[in-house]
Amino acid sequence: MSNIYANSYLIIFVFLCLGVLLPIGALTAGRWLRPHVPSDAKATTYESGNNPFHDSRVQFQVRYYLFALLFVIFDIETVFLYPWAVVYDQLGLFALVEMIIFIVLLAIGLIYAWKKKVLRWM
């Protein structure tokens, strides 16, 4: 019986090693095989064949990052809510209480962001 478990872990270990070593090997082979000829033209912005008219490094305001961070947080909330809603009948009262606590904590975070005026654009 323990041989079955050992084989299961062996398969996981093999896939883990392949998942780490294959990308490292591909990146290393690409670095060794590619021609490396740096030039100023390669460092400029590609403007669909036109000459670039300004620097490609544009500074974004912090508001964009805050909106993106809030979107990711509440998007992941829906990822956790969907499987729970699908199997709600089988989980019982304990899972309902856990999910209510989860939603309340996220609501507290949303209220905090609202009070700090993170959601205000201008």
Swiss-Prot record:
Gene3D superfamilies per record: NADH:ubiquinone/plastoquinone oxidoreductase, chain 3
Membrane topology reported for the UniProt record: Multi-pass membrane protein
InterPro entries to which the protein is assigned, alphabetical: NAD(P)H_OxRDtase_bac/plastid, NADH_UbQ/plastoQ_OxRdtase_su3, NDAH_ubi_oxred_su3_sf
Sorted UniProt keywords: Cell membrane, Membrane, NAD, Quinone, Translocase, Transmembrane, Transmembrane helix, Transport
Disulfide pairings: none
GO molecular function terms attached to this record: NADH dehydrogenase (ubiquinone) activity; NADH:ubiquinone reductase (non-electrogenic) activity; quinone binding
Catalytic reactions of this protein: a quinone + NADH + 5 H(+)(in) = a quinol + NAD(+) + 4 H(+)(out)
Compartment list: Cell membrane
Keyword Protein transport: no
EC number, UniProt record: 7.1.1.-
Domain of life of the source: Bacteria
GO CC, alphabetical: NADH dehydrogenase complex; plasma membrane
Main location: membrane
Segments forming a coiled coil: none
Segments crossing the lipid bilayer: 10-30, 67-87, 91-111
Phosphoprotein listed as a keyword: no
Function: NDH-1 shuttles electrons from NADH, via FMN and iron-sulfur (Fe-S) centers, to quinones in the respiratory chain. The immediate electron acceptor for the enzyme in this species is believed to be a menaquinone. Couples the redox reaction to proton translocation (for every two electrons transferred, four hydrogen ions are translocated across the cytoplasmic membrane), and thus conserves the redox energy in a proton gradient.
Similarity field: Belongs to the complex I subunit 3 family.
NCBIfam families assigned to the protein according to its UniProt record, in alphabetical order: PRK07756.1
Subunit organization: NDH-1 is composed of 14 different subunits. Subunits NuoA, H, J, K, L, M, N constitute the membrane sector of the complex.
The protein's name: NADH-quinone oxidoreductase subunit A
Organism: Geobacillus kaustophilus (strain HTA426)
